[in-house]
Curated annotation (Swiss-Prot):
Protein name: Inhibitor of apoptosis protein
Gene source species: African swine fever virus (isolate Tick/Malawi/Lil 20-1/1983) (ASFV)
Family note: Belongs to the asfivirus IAP family.
Annotated binding of Zn(2+), by residue: 62, 65, 82, 89
Organism placement in taxonomy: Viruses, Varidnaviria, Bamfordvirae, Nucleocytoviricota, Pokkesviricetes
Assembly mode: Interacts with subunit p17 of host CASP3.
GO molecular function, one term: zinc ion binding
Length: 224
């Protein structure tokens, strides 16, 4: 989860002031809960408790400061992310207090450095990897922009991971085994990457005996 406009308050203001919410209609937790519930979003309480309400499938908004966040649906710590990017939000100040907000930001800095920045590097790495593999620019934009978003997750399914989402680095890893060109709907063998195969297969006839056991353990496939 990250802000739609990539800005960050560099300090926490010590001035005491009253903040009028930008979206008064979502000031109550019930109103924010309802914004998620009517769109059949599950486990939405952590977002509404963080002062956020549903805007679109790719965007949520803080009712108080008005900051918008993208790629939010699998975020585990929305309160921390909200406080990290919007340090002078009236809701965050009222919820945690200035001292509590400072402590939370300090603890979140490690997560942001080790997780978020690494994912950004993986994104850049994946673009270069896909380019080297001969994929078109339109396909690379498709992967990088929509890898986490439904309905595009159906293209890469049955992925066994500890988390519910996969990183961009894993996309590159998967595609290095199974070369798929969405532009002309051609699928290649997961092992040799040379022989063309049917859409419902994973290996060419020559590679099937060598990879059947490995495929059963890894348990992923690509569906077009």
């Amino acid at each position: 989860m990250y802000p739609k406009i990539n800005t960050i308050d560099t300090y926490i203001s010590l001035r005491l002031f009253e903040v009028k919410p930008k979206y008064v209609g979502y000031s109550s937790v019930d109103a924010r809960n309802k914004s998620f519930a009517i769109h059949d979003i599950k486990n939405y309480e952590k977002f509404s408790n963080a002062g956020l309400f549903y805007t679109s499938p790719t965007e949520i908004t803080c009712y108080c400061c008005g900051m918008k966040f993208c790629n939010w649906i699998y975020e585990k710590h929305p309160l921390q992310v909200h406080g990290f990017w919007s340090r002078n939000c009236g809701f965050m100040r009222a919820t945690l207090g200035i001292i509590g907000l400072k402590k939370m930001i300090d603890s979140y800095n490690d997560y942001f450095t080790n997780e978020v920045s690494v994912k950004h590097k993986n994104r850049v790495y994946t673009h270069k990897r896909l380019e080297d593999m001969g994929f078109s620019k339109s396909f690379m934009r498709f992967i990088l922009a929509n890898a986490f978003m439904p309905p595009y997750r159906k293209y890469i399914h049955k992925i066994i991971l500890n988390e519910r989402y996969f990183t961009f680095k894993f996309v590159a890893y998967l595609l290095s085994f199974h070369k798929v060109n969405l532009d002309n709907q051609i699928t290649y063998c997961m092992t040799c990457g040379i022989e063309q195969i049917n859409k419902d297969e994973n290996f060419c006839n020559a590679c099937k005996p060598l990879n059947y056991k490995h495929y059963k353990i890894l348990n992923f496939s690509v569906k077009l």
